């Protein structure tokens, strides 16, 4: 069984309440149940923190044992060299996800400090961005292909 860790960063604990026109009305916990039902071949763990260092600690904790990490770093995406370095330090492939199309939003959201360290980026598909990331991470061909591309 593949082990997938979802990590959500700052303010994503407010999904369903925060800016529903941007992020939708569903809580992440409700969506997580759907993901687990859709991917019974994967053990999907979930972690959320508003604290940068705690997110880094979680990446370090699972980054050598899990088959994939789905990371929505929230606003830390645009500011954190430390997250970039944490992703580069581990062997588990990381897919960066965003619920909204960050390139259609404020200009300060157009630059990601972590994309270059990730195996892939999926954004703008609402909560389905997570499903798309898990689908790729659970596909054996993805790991082989991304190893060739990123090495």
Language model feature labels by segment:
Residues 1-4:
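Extreme N-terminal starter segment of soluble prokaryotic enzymes
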Residues 10-12, 74-77, 100-102:
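Short glycine-rich anion-binding loops that position phosphate/pyrophosphate groups of nucleotides
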Residues 14-29:
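Glycine- and acidic-residue-enriched helix-capping/strand-helix junction motifs
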Residues 45-53:
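Short beta->alpha junction loops
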Residues 62-69:
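Short acidic/histidine-rich motifs immediately flanking catalytic phosphotransfer sites
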Residues 80-89:
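Short Gly/Thr/Asp-enriched flexible loops that form oxyanion-binding sites at enzyme active sites
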Residues 89-105:
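Short, acidic/small-residue loops that bind anionic groups at enzyme active sites
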Residues 104-147:
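Short, glycine-/small-residue-rich phosphate/pyrophosphate-handling segment
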């Amino acid at each position: 069984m593949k082990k997938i860790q979802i990590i959500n960063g700052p303010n994503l604990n407010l999904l369903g309440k925060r800016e529903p026109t941007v992020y939708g009305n569903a809580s992440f916990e409700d969506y997580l149940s759907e993901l687990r039902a859709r991917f019974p071949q994967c053990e999907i763990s979930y972690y959320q923190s508003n604290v940068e260092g705690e997110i880094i600690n979680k990446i370090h904790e699972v980054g050598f044992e899990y088959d994939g990490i789905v990371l929505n770093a929230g606003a830390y995406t645009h500011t954190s060299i430390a997250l970039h370095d944490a992703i580069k330090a581990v062997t588990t492939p990381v897919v960066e996800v965003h619920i909204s199309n960050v390139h259609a939003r404020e200009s300060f959201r157009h630059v990601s400090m972590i994309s270059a360290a990730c195996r892939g980026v999926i954004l703008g598909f609402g909560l389905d961005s997570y499903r798309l990331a898990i689908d790729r991470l659970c596909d054996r061909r993805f790991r082989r292909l991304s190893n060739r591309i990123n090495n």
